[in-house]
């Protein structure tokens, strides 16, 4: 993290969510597949899943006393017919701002 120093590594933290596909979304996605274009229903579902998994990971990091998470990675997997897991993980750390190397001429 630019301008910060990691002072303590706490632990690996993660968050996940499992979502199932919606029959209506599948039908519309099938039509889009034929004519081409973005599958917006799935894009929205994936964005919701990312947000939920991230919030769960952040909550775990905060419970450890972390003020940052580094090395964040996302992974997806199919776990059952029509259901997928989105998994996010990273390392919970404590960071502190670096001391400026030169005096700031704008803040005497």
Swiss-Prot record:
InterPro entries, per database record: UPF0145_dom_sf, UPF0145_YbjQ-like
Source organism (scientific name): Acinetobacter baylyi (strain ATCC 33305 / BD413 / ADP1)
Family: Belongs to the UPF0145 family.
HAMAP family named in the record: UPF0145
Top-level lineage group: Bacteria
Protein name: UPF0145 protein ACIAD2946
The organism's taxonomic lineage, starting at the top: Bacteria, Pseudomonadati, Pseudomonadota, Gammaproteobacteria, Moraxellales
């Amino acid at each position: 993290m630019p301008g910060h120093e990691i002072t303590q590594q706490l632990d690996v933290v993660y968050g996940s969510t499992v979502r199932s596909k919606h029959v209506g979304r599948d039908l519309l996605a099938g039509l889009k597949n034929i004519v081409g274009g973005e599958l917006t229903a799935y894009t929205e579902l994936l964005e919701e899943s990312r947000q939920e998994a991230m919030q769960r990971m952040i909550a775990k990091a905060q419970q450890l006393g972390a003020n940052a998470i580094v090395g964040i990675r996302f992974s997806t997997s199919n776990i059952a017919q029509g259901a997928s897991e989105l998994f996010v993980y990273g390392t919970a750390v404590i960071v502190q701002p670096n001391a400026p190397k030169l005096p700031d001429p704008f803040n005497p």
